[in-house]
Swiss-Prot record:
Belongs to the PPR family. PCMP-H subfamily. Residues 729-823 are annotated as: Type DYW motif. This is Pentatricopeptide repeat-containing protein At4g33990. Keywords: Repeat. Residues 698-728 are annotated as: Type E(+) motif. GO terms for biological process: RNA modification. It holds the Pfam family DYW_deaminase. It comes from Arabidopsis thaliana. Disulfide bonds: none annotated. PPR repeats lie at residues 85-115, 116-151, 152-183, 184-214, 215-249, 252-280, 281-311, 312-346, 347-381, 383-413, 414-448, 450-484, 485-515, 516-550, 551-581, 587-617. Residues 622-697 are annotated as: Type E motif. PANTHER family: (WILD MALAYSIAN BANANA) HYPOTHETICAL PROTEIN, PENTATRICOPEPTIDE REPEAT-CONTAINING PROTEIN. GO terms for molecular function: RNA binding; zinc ion binding. Signal peptide: none annotated.
Length: 823
């Protein structure tokens, strides 16, 4: 009896009742309908074709595209005894590995008699394809110890790829040298990949330079090695020696251009890919989208995407991410919908982009739907990155409690998870909680902090004024060898600068490479924050002298520094230079700094004219800057005009209602105060409470305006009362204009005395040694009366008092403030 692809009557026992015949008939119907491969096998093994030569058997391997047909072929080879041929058995091993069943491959391999090096190579590479590095090494060791064979050039690439340490790689390197395969292009390229993977790119380059012959694979290995190790500029320099490129080279170099910020070189490579027909290759087009997205060239991204004949999931993810990165969420959502209509199913990367897009839109309900979708898919358990993305999503929405809940729910956490929750707290103003999360991470000791951790927690120290905590982190950085990392040290310098230690910030600045604008921007901003506008301008000129190109952030920090120091002429010079010399189009932040600068200088009409001449539609920050200036300078009429425009674009912002109310209060227009407060109350808006904080004995103490719940409140109040009497004796007169309530003078004086910074000063005078520096951090602008009082206190107590408010630093010493009463 014959059936389908098998001839098995002598090998299968007969079943009673013909049941086995019916089983065979059922199996036959399945095989006949299973696939083209099964039909091909049937055609080759019909009656009269059983004596085909081995060459015909080799052709059958091409038809085996699934495990079932491979097993059919295996059975036939066993029956025909062709399995005894080493070459055929080895091909069967390779087939099983290709189809993903390494266990069957190993079973077949173990039954091969007189295995040759070809069979060993296929088994070793099969383990490598399956990602089983330990079995690759074990199989190679067995080959070297028991086979009595000599490895060839095909043996080493898979083994080198499986090496888990550079020491293991060195051992295999020695073996390749011993057996004479050192300069085989495949082996050499694998060695370059190995050394690059373990950050020994110098060894890789030596090997590359010594190669007598280099093929395209060798060049690609070295270029990608530089990219993997973060040496993008070296990769681009090396590519200058290339006469031709293939698609792999193009993809590596496009990544290098993105990392190095070399847009022009990326365009040149794109032109090459078009000329040589490489742009049409799927992964080249995908990488081009990534390149243009990084530089904000969304039109070019769209052009590349539109020209693609075939688009895969990566293509859609790339174009969606491009619009997400450049904060165009509506277009990104539209593309996501197009992707679904194209029957492309989203993956984790799609959902990560979607989470960011929806957080940009502020759509809380849709964001929760994303979380629900990932839960149903089980991706929280499979991929930690999706959980991290959901934490980021809630943090961007300001829902830090939801972010913390998701973080606590994650089945596993990595360093990125911790960095995400720390930065989420810090970015939403919860500096103490961010520092606490970092301390918890350190106490658990399961996950080591990395660059991202320091860059997340140091801004929290800056925000809270936690200088001692920041100094502890500085010590950790020294211990962990991250002291010379540019981004970490820049964050550290920013921390010192914003905690009032400008000299330490400057010292760190001159210890790191200053080849890009990031460290320069930080130091310029710190000097501006301290009111040292002239020094900020000098730093900017020094930056230009060192050949560093300023970016849009540089000019924001510089204009802000000019604003806080009253340098109107210098600010105008910078604003014009930004456009004429560097081709930077002013953003709303640049315009806002200019309006603020004119307003602080009292040039209110000039500020209004400047707003009317803007090429962009003024937003709330522009009109808010003008309203703030009108409040300081008492121009109620212009303030009303500014507020009308302001509430058109931002009607629900409580801070602007408070600002307008304060302007009316300062002018004694209590009817206007009542009206604005009534409007704010009707909208359900609540005023942000004023608070001040200071660090004492490694603990951050927080004081709220008018709050009487502090354990030492009575002692602090007695200290303030005694101070008040001394201050009046040397000329202090309370300025009731800064009391924003229509009450009696005695009550006004009490309200002024309960401002948060005064409570903090009283606490510091009680809790810290005499004549030591007091550092206070305030979330709102210092009022004029508190500014005067602090000057007097610094004189009679012989203390230096450093106050950082929402705008800048004030250094009070011997009755004088560093701001020169200009803030």
């Amino acid at each position: 009896m014959k059936f389908g692809t098998f001839s098995l009557p002598r090998q299968i026992p007969t079943c009673k009742g013909g049941r086995f015949t019916r089983v065979l008939q059922s199996i036959g119907s399945v095989i006949r309908e299973f696939s083209a491969s099964a039909n091909a096998l049937q055609d080759c093994w019909k009656n009269g074709n059983e004596s085909k030569e081995i060459d015909d058997v080799h052709t059958l391997f091409r038809y085996c595209t699934n495990l079932q047909s491979a097993k059919c072929l295996h059975a036939r080879l066993v029956v025909s005894k062709q399995i005894q041929n080493v070459c055929i058995s080895a091909k069967l091993v390779n087939l099983y590995c290709y189809l993903g069943n390494v266990a069957l491959a190993r079973h077949t391999f173990d039954h091969i008699q007189n295995r040759d090096v070809y069979a060993w190579n296929l088994m070793i590479s099969g383990y490598g394809r399956a990602g089983n590095s330990s079995e690759v090494i074990r199989c190679f060791s067995l080959f070297m110890l028991s086979s009595g064979l000599t490895p060839d050039y095909r043996t080493f690439p898979s083994v080198l790829k499986a090496c888990r340490t550079v020491i293991d790689g060195n051992k295999i390197h020695c073996l390749a040298l011993k057996f004479g395969f050192m300069w085989d292009v495949y082996v050499a390229a694998s060695l370059i990949h190995l050394y690059s993977r373990y950050k020994a790119v110098g060894n890789a380059r030596i090997l590359f330079d010594e190669m007598p012959v280099r093929d395209m694979g060798s060049w690609n290995a070295m270029i990608s090695g530089y990219c993997q190790s973060g040496n993008a500029k070296e990769a681009l320099t090396l590519s200058n020696g290339l006469r031709a490129m293939d698609s792999v080279t193009v993809v590596s170099l496009l990544s290098a251009c993105t990392e190095a910020g070399d847009f022009n070189r990326g365009v040149t490579i794109h032109s090459y890919s078009i000329k040589h027909g490489l742009e049409s290759e799927l992964f080249v087009s995908n990488k081009l989208i990534d390149l243009y997205a990084e530089f904000g060239r969304l039109r070019d991204c769209q052009k590349v995407f539109d020209r693609m004949y075939v688009r895969d999931l990566i293509s859609w993810n790339s174009i969606i991410k491009a619009y997400e990165l450049n904060e165009q969420p509506l277009r990104a959502i539209s593309l996501f919908q197009e992707m679904r209509l194209s029957r492309i199913q989203p993956d984790c990367l799609t959902l990560i982009s979607l989470a960011s897009i929806l957080s940009q839109l502020g759509d809380i309900r849709a964001c929760r739907s994303v979380q629900g979708f990932t839960l149903r898919k089980g991706w929280f358990l499979e991929d930690i990155t999706i959980g991290n993305a959901v934490v980021v999503m809630y943090a961007k929405l300001g829902l830090v409690d939801s972010a913390r809940a998701v973080f606590n729910w994650l089945p596993n956490t990595d360093v990125i998870s911790w960095n995400t929750i720390i930065s989420g707290y810090a970015q939403n103003g919860f500096a103490s909680e961010a520092i606490e999360m970092y301390n918890i991470m350190e106490e658990e000791g399961e996950i080591a902090a990395n660059q991202g951790t320091w860059v997340s927690v140091l801004p929290a120290c800056s925000q809270a004024g936690a200088l001692r905590q920041g100094m502890k982190l500085h010590g950790r950085l020294l211990k962990n060898g991250l002291y010379l990392d540019v981004f970490v040290v820049t964050s550290l310098a920013d921390m010192y600068g914003k905690c009032g230690r400008l000299e330490d910030a400057l010292s760190l600045f001159y210890q790191i490479p200053r080849v890009n604008s990031v460290p320069w921007n930080t130091l310029i901003a710190c000097h501006g924050f301290h009111g040292h506008g002239e020094k900020a301008v000098m730093l900017f000129k020094e930056m230009l002298d060192e050949g560093v190109k300023p970016d849009h952030i540089t000019f924001v920090t510089l204009l802000s520094a000019c604003s806080h120091s009253g340098l109107v002429d210098e600010g105008q010079w910078c604003f014009e230079m930004m456009q004429t010399d560097y081709g930077i189009t002013p953003s709303l932040k640049h315009y806002g700094c200019m309006v603020d600068m004119y307003g602080r200088a009292g040039q209110l009409e000039t500020a209004l004219k400047f707003i009317k001449s803007m090429s962009l539609q003024p937003d709330a920050s522009i009109w808010g800057a003008l309203l703030s200036a009108c409040r300081v300078h008492g121009n109620v009429d212009l303030g009303k005009i500014a507020s009308e425009h302001l509430f058109e674009v931002e009607p629900e912002h409580v801070g602007y209602h408070v600002l307008l109310s304060n302007m009316y209060a300062s002018a004694g227009k209590w009817e206007g105060v009542d009206e604005i407060r009534s409007i704010a109350h009707g909208k359900g808006l609540r005023k942000t409470p004023g608070w001040s904080s200071m660090e004492v004995d490694n603990k951050v103490e927080v004081f709220y305006t008018g709050n009487q719940t502090h354990p030492m409140y009575e002692e602090m109040y007695r200290e303030l009362t005694a101070l008040q009497a001394k201050l009046k004796m040397i000329g202090y007169v309370p300025d009731h204009r800064f009391v924003l309530q229509d009450v009696e003078d005695d009550e006004k004086e009490h309200i002024l005395m309960s401002h948060s910074e005064r409570l903090a000063i009283a606490f510091a005078l009680i809790a810290t040694p005499a004549k030591t520096t007091i550092r206070i951090f305030k979330n709102l602008r210092v009022c004029g009366d508190c500014h005067s009082v602090t000057k007097f206190i610094s004189k009679i107590t012989e203390r230096e008092i450093i106050v950082r408010d929402s705008n800048r630093f004030h250094h009070f010493k011997n009755g004088v403030c560093s701001c020169g009463d200009y803030w």
